[in-house]
Amino acid sequence: ADNLSKVYDVQKKRPGLSGSLRDLYSPVYEKKVAVKDVSFVIDEGELVGFIGPNGAGKTTTLKMLSGLLYPSGGSVSVIGHDPWKREYDFLKNISLVMGQKNQLWWDLPAIESFNLAKDIYGISDSSYKKTLNNLVEMLEIGDVLNVQVRKLSLGQRMKAELVAALIHSPK
């Protein structure tokens, strides 16, 4: 990422009923800077964590790196791709886990979501079994693979979300 920035146009709300009506027909916008001139390099295989207060731009930056948001300024290259072009070769090699988003089907056992990911990503049976076994052992969730996701504790669900995000061995 080089001088990565994201600026949103946010509607300014006017008080009262008359203000709400005016906002409906003639909204007023102000600029909200979410990310300002962020630059960094992450080498392949390097683990990185984003920490900071609410509103610091962590999620916005991750969304730009994954191609979910187009930056207002700067440039990004992730494994040799422009993320917002959403190329298949790029998408099959990344993963993003966010606390509010679920990859697991709520009404099915976690293993069914993993099996679906296997088919979506075209993972061979042998590679899938090896990766699944490694992740399940590392995260110690073997005893809950066949439990309906809605019945898992938050910790168990987060571990299962990690398995779903990593099952295709993203770069």
Name the predicted role of every residue range.
Residues 2-34:
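Pre-NBD coupling/linker segments of ABC/ABC-like ATPases
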Residues 74-85, 90-91:
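Conserved ABC transporter NBD signature motif
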Residues 167-171:
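A short, proline-enriched helix->beta-strand linker immediately N-terminal to the Walker B motif
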Residues 17-24, 115, 119, 126-144:
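Conserved ABC ATPase "signature" region
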Residues 162:
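Hydrophobic anchor residue at the start of the ABC signature
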Residues 66:
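Helix-to-loop junction immediately C-terminal to a conserved catalytic motif
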